[in-house]
Amino acid sequence: MKILHLDTNHPTLLEQLNTAGFENHEDYTSSKVEIEKKIHNYDGIIIRSRFSIDKHFLQQASKLKFIGRVGAGLENIDCRIAKSKDIELIAAPEGNRNAVGEHTLGMLLSLFNKLNKTDKEVKKGVWLREENRGVELDGKTIGIIGYGNMGKSFAKKLRGFDIEVLCFDIKPSVGDENCKQVSLGELKEKADVLSLHAPQTARTEKMINTSFINSFTKNFWLINTARGRSVVTKDLVLGLKSGKILGAGLDVLEYEKSSFENLFSKNLMPDAFKYLITAENVLLSPHVGGWTQESKEKLAQTIVAKIKIKFSANKI
């Protein structure tokens, strides 16, 4: 089988696929149009987020048997068309779930203890203690929306705290020893913190809007290490200004065209984002929640293992 690699990844990915008997070709620079002209020669492709795999692209891929996405989400792939062509979709949420869990916890603790603000102040020679009293996590209720690989990883990281962890998921019976599954209504009633871990779907897009925010009983902190389009940023800003949202940790933004492209290619910064970058109770990172030295290798290993199980004649 011939595999076309469209993004660089950890060396172990190519090494192990070569060992397993696959023929691997690399093209990290050609345009999407140029790739479309030769994709009919390949049985598989491996991609991160270089470009979208849309209907037109898939129509050219007459031999394609699988798409390996070195990451968790598949929103940049036309999954309906791929499935209609019997193309196997292989993702690797297991590969970076630990990284996402740690990043989410790090953001939460940083917000509670105002680490972003105090770091900047001390570096400017400002020494304020009373103004920077933090908040303890113990005694709080954490609400998680989306209890798959990422949500479970975050809940596991919380085990050392004296807190209650609740989750809402459209799938039944996903709760475990780290988290109690509840209705969305109960989560909204009890949560001090809302952490998003749901994939991008029609149901989750623009889910966090003014109506949703105001339906929470308590004022709350928001953490989003999932997908930026789940949050309506202008409504988030209204929540921050009113105090309904006490602070926000955002690893993803609705303005992203895709995970790793330049956020503002036309230098048109939305007003809501201007507020976020100046707000002391907002912590931002550039979609790196699952982006660690360790996860880079784990993602590669996960993709290789799944490809071997499905397609390799030399199964290990």
Q: Could you tell me what each predicted segment is?
A:
Residues 61-66, 85-87, 163, 218-220, ...:
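A short helix->loop->beta-strand "cap" motif at the edges of active sites that frequently abuts
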Residues 1, 130-218:
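Rossmann-like dinucleotide/phosphate-binding beta-alpha-beta segment
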Residues 219-222, 227-316:
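Rossmann-like dinucleotide-binding domain for NAD(H)/NADP(H)
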Residues 85-87, 93-141, 153-156, 160:
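Phosphate-binding beta-alpha-beta segment of Rossmann-like dinucleotide-binding domains, i.e.
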